[in-house]
Amino acid sequence: MEIEIYDELNSSDSLKQINGLSKLNQFWINQGRDPTLFFTSIIKLISETDNKTTRILCYSILKSCKCTPSDWSLAIPLLVKDLNSDDNEVVISILKTLPHISSIFTELLMMGNADFGPLVRHGNPSVRKTALDTLTSLLFYRKSILQSYKSFVSTGWELIVDRILEEPIPMVYQSSFSAISSLFSEISRSVSHSDELDNSVQKRQVLSYYADWISLKLIDHFDLLLNRAQHIDINQRHSTVNTLTYLVDTISRSSGTPFWPTSFDNNNNNNNNQQINNNNNNNNNNNNNNNNNNNNNNNNNNNNNQNNLINGISSMNLSSITGTTTTTTTTGNSPITSPTSPTSIIANTASSNKTKQISSPQNIVSILVEYFLSQLDSSNDSLVFAVGKAILDLLLTQQNQHNENWINPVLTAFIGLLRREGVSLNPLPILLAIMSVLPMLGDDLLFCTLSRIFPSIKSITDSNQRVSYLIRTFELIIDRHVTSSGKSSLFTPLMTTDCLLMAFQDESSSFREEIIVSMVASHHNILSKYIEIESEKNSNNNNSSSGNSGGGSGGSVKFSTSGNLFYLHQAALNISEVCLKCITWQSERISAIEYCIRFVDWLCRVTLSSSSSSNNSGNGSESQYGIKLISLLRSDLLDQINKIPSDYICLQAVFLICTHLLRSPTNKVYEQSDAGLLISLLRRRFLFLDNQPKFTQYNGNIRDMIMGVSQFGRVSPASLHSLSGYWLGALECLYLMGLHIPSVEATVQRTLEEILATYPHNKSVYSRARFIRRMLFSSTSSALDAQSLGKYSTIRNLNSFTNYTIDFSYCIPIEQLEASNSLHSISDIFAYECKKAITGLVGVHYGSSIRDKSSRDVTLISGASDPVWIEVSHTTHPTLNTITLHVQVTNVIHFSIKNVNIMIGLSGHLDFPYPQTNCKHNIPKLLPEKSYSFEVPLNVSSLDYNLVTFKLTFNQPSGLCESENNINLNNIHTKINNYQQSSDQLLVQSIQQQQQQQQSSSQQQSQQSQQQQYQPQPISSVNSGLSSYSLNSNNSGSLNSSANSHSISTSAVGSPGTASFISSSLLSNAQSSSPTTSSPLSNVINQNIISSSSSSSSNANQITSTTTPSSTTNSNNNTTSSSSSTNPNPNPNSHTNLNSIVGSGINQPIINNQIIQSLSITTNNPSANIIQFSPIEIRCSDYIFDWNQFLIPFKYNKHQFIQQWPRFEAVFSIDVVFEGFVSVASIFDCLSALPLHNVLNSEFGNSNFHFAFSSSTWFNEQFCFTISGMEKCLSFPEDYSIYYTSPNGQSLPKYKVYHARFEFRSSSSSLLASFESIIDQWINKLPRPTSDQFIARLLAPDEKSLFSITNITQDYQAPKNHQSLANTPLSNIVDDEIALLNQWKDFKKSQEQTKKLFSQLALDQDFY
């Protein structure tokens, strides 16, 4: 193909030239290859041909070339020549090429031909438009041009300003509008979207300087700009909004106060409408009003005019982010006399040769807003949203925040955008714009607006943004209720609207729970704000009270009868009335219900305590609030308590009623009946469950079913937790009722006695119930006096029992009481234990959405061929923001392993709950086929990028390292046989290579041995691990194990370089980030050789003949003294046992001779009995938490709402295969050649990567993508040469296949849909800047992506390899890994089956 294209490009026939260029574009560039190879032929073709089509094709191909500046210098004369060409299409093709070859921009400037003046004033409008677009892209997206060529930049902006004023064709000056709008948006936004996200102060200052200069140039031409904007096509007219709005705001700020007052009432609105309708008198009245206002505010504005101009330019946020929706709206009661009145007036002014402007600094805002209001009827969504957002921005910046004539049409248009049917979009940009207007609205209009936008709030895709918007909305409602002294109450009517009633009945979505949480969080935020205000007032008046606290959840706030806190109390009652309806919801997301229960508990403590004190003072309103709250507790909580589906919420509700309702004086009549109802509920649902076959506990819920014992006669009863959180909470509720309610003493005492009689063998439950009974009903005179039981209660006889120290001999601790030393009283100990019970710190967890189950399957993070397996799972606790990590360590070989250490590291937003958490776990001795389990508690503060790292170190297996009488290696043959086949071929090659070297250079070795008698072996130099070969003089050429982590590199054991090489290979294995797949036994053998070499080198002065290479074959005595041993007594059969370990395919005499010598036994050397073994270190795979595995509610305390426009709303993903002689670096170079910014670059080893790229385009056409890739394990020759053929016949090991998942995101769904239709062409056209020896393709129809394999459900069958390659080390390792993984899965399946056989809960589940 290359030769054919090259011949056609160098042909003299124009048709062949065009054909060659077409082939180059279709079969080369479209396949992602770099056409730089044909650069010389293309330059020659441009210089010689006169054919227009050929030249245009050549310039389009030059955009894809990656040449050096010296090569580009050949093209500069041709570019300069053709820029002055008479052919417009050639000039346009060169202009489109210039941004892609900006590296030669310096040469173009030096030659004086980079002046865009003649181009932007060209006679052809297409050339002028292309020149403006090219100039804009050079000014914005080329950082070097902005910094280095200041004269070119200033000249370029002058040309853009000149075209926006002088250009007659709308299609052309629309490009100038776009460029200036982009500049104004760039200096207004908080984060830059251009030039690689460069947010430096220097760049902002330079852009602000040009923006100020452009504003001064265009201020006098506003009428002309407004007239020109109306002639632009309606689909592109949104690009003019930023320019007009920025200019109007700058003019208005620099001139002073406009004619309207700061607040509007009905009379002012009517007068304003009359003034606008009378066009003749309008200007005079406005000028008179303005003169008066300017005279009144002269002293305030004279000193600030210049500052207002600068601050207005630098601080405005007027960027218009457009959406992809359509609407038809009406302007409502807008102050427009006729839709075409601004157009006609401005046209007349433009035709009168600028005799007198109709716009003045006082009425220029009104003129622009009238024009914008007329555009709200447009059918283009981008224009509707842009002008609506601009009107709202002018309302906020021009001190006209109550002009309903502006607000109503915009609200109508925006709600029309939100309620369009058949349009799928992210409504957050429109809702954020509406949020800025909500504080300006009256109560009626606010209620109507909120009721209409609530369905759109539900459609926000991101949960965090949805909850944040709800919090801001409810904060506005509560704040307005407080500031209006209770006159504005929107909670009750808003909650009775149809949209919210339907939301509360929808069980499939979490929107109703988010509404409940947002109400509670917003009240907490407003309360915190007003408490700070009240405390400041009290401190100023020197009347500060220590009783007020800043927290809304635990403080004892005393409400006064007048003031803000009093009306906040009213709002809290309204919220609790709405929230208590949620306790009967059938939902696993009970965090919202828990928020509600705790909020009502806080409100009861505040209200009922204040109402009891106000009854003494005679205040009736506070007692009325207390009566209302008691009635709410009775009607919405007590009457519905049997219908609460969640045991956890039910127990909290009982605790709430025992604490507040039963102790209220107004509830004396119903005290005994209510307490009896609660005690029966506790007995039936929580207490009498343990070891009773007729009651069954299933998934946390109790089913009261009576079944025959014979059905479950063979099954052991369900073993529940001895003292779970339910037990503790139920006993605490009994304690509260027995302590505070005398009328139910007999019922409580009888219940405790039945517990003691029913569960005598459950020591925890028995001791806890006995402790409560003695505290409540034992006599003060004598604990052994049975007649006085129940007459004199120990606790009630004491006036204050807070100082009463308890006897811990009555109370067995639940687990270990962390704060036992600081708890000295009965109330403290019970409050602490109840807190542990309610919040789930002890016993079963009852707040999680995944009950009593691990949040994901067990994951094997160690290598399947490692002697120690580490299996990890976790359980989330959403109500606590914690995770419990379950780690199981298993010894899978037949030898015990000593001193196993597991180091745990945290990354991301994970943390240990307290500093003394042990992150290092030590196992002194791990027996064969035994498991050791432990748990690690973790705190979670955020959901992104969380992972746990594991590092495993252990000593050599005791069967190989300890000094025993016999070495018997037959025991581990069954476990390790599959591990060692991978090193057969390498060992054979190395031994044959060494044998040849020994035969050919025996004389040279003898000479070297004489020199080495006085020179010790440099073993210490090996620890650096920098060299792939052994650091010895003869350099035996051993293989480097770091080149292939799957192979066991072994050289001749007799050579002196073996120890250094093996130590470097072990260091590389220990430092690798992926799980080790090498054999543990080979590491053991290599480690013994290392120790032997180290001991021999340490004793080099005593034994000088040990470093002689020839001694390995000539003298057995030298070899024996040079190597340390694992056995003081030699075993004559050890060489036969080693055959099963090392491999049977090795030459038998050689392996016997070498291995026996390396493991021979010495008794002559006294230092051989002291053996130093360094532990084996394994770095396991990271245990990664996905964001959806946490299910943790957000913390809403002082929630900060980020007002930032979302950048992306649409997304689609696709899997791509990179196949050939490819690497991670070549893939990154391939993607870096795209015109996108690399915002994330993460490489994990040589086989995994994660990149992210983002664009810098404008006006809601933003685009980004992330790519995650992993290397696929291949088996040759099946996986080779399917879609790609090697051009150079390279070797098979260099051939790789990477599976990558692209995830594309864009703020425009239509853009993403059009991009999706050409994704296959885009993949094929990926550039190849460095190497083109690989292809990028989509998945084949029968091909499965690696990303779609989330778990292993069935045994994976290894592909059948070719006969000639069946014994390769790589194929053996793959087979061994798969076999071990299948063995691990079988083991897990057998465990699950045994659990099902003996678990009554599982049988009950299957039965139902």
Swiss-Prot record:
Q: List the disulfide bonds.
A: none
Q: What residue range is the signal peptide? A: none
- Stretches with biased composition (Low complexity): 266-308, 319-347, 998-1051
The family note in this entry says: Belongs to the TPLATE family.
What protein is this chain from? Answer: TSET complex member tstA
Subunit structure of this chain's protein: Component of the TSET complex, a heterohexamer composed of tstA, tstB, tstC, tstD, tstE and tstF, which may act in plasma membrane turnover. tstA, tstB, tstC and tstD are likely to be the core complex members with tstE and tstF acting as associated scaffold proteins.
Q: InterPro entries recorded for this chain?
A: ARM-like, ARM-type_fold, Clathrin/coatomer_adapt-like_N, TPLATE
**Gene Ontology CC annotations of this record:** membrane coat
